[in-house]
Amino acid sequence: SAAEVLVDEKNKVYGVATGDMGVSRDGSAKDSWESGMELHAKYTLFSEGARGSLSKYLIDNFDLSEGKDYQKYAIGIKELWEVKEENHQEGLVEHSMGWPLSDGTGGGSFLYHFGQNQVSVGYVVHLNYSNPYVSPFDEFQQFKTHPSVKSVLAGGKRISYGARAITAGDYQSVPKL
């Protein structure tokens, strides 16, 4: 993966460099050591997630957040379920805010009905909560006990799941592109 942004003397991005391979924990070179390589490109697309190290460098180096609001972050948890046919409504999209979160903790949910009796259910919790005991995973589990969600998932089977940090700021917090 990329470890460094390549910038020329005119402050123009011309690619990325990968990290060295075969480096031991103490930083010394192993027998398998190989130098990282430079990948030069006319266009370089950065897509490393909510707060990647290369993105932070680009935002700082090119002052891309000037005049922008601070970015907000959240944790998003998602599960893919195969549900009973009678609980499925292909194309249905549902969103909610709040419950079961307490006052002062932002977040919400989604429930998307895909084809083949598949439903994606997810919960997002903003990471600016003041209660240090808030557990986004536990909030998600409680959310699935809500009658409208529980009835969709009843008798179904979770087939995959995942979680990741996401940006949750509004348009005013998106860096210049």
For each of these PLM feature ranges, what is it?
Residues 151-163:
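A short coil-to-beta-strand element that immediately follows conserved catalytic motifs
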Residues 164-177:
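FAD-binding beta-loop-beta segment adjacent to the flavin cofactor pocket
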Residues 2-154:
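Predominantly flavin-linked oxidoreductase catalytic cores and closely associated redox partners
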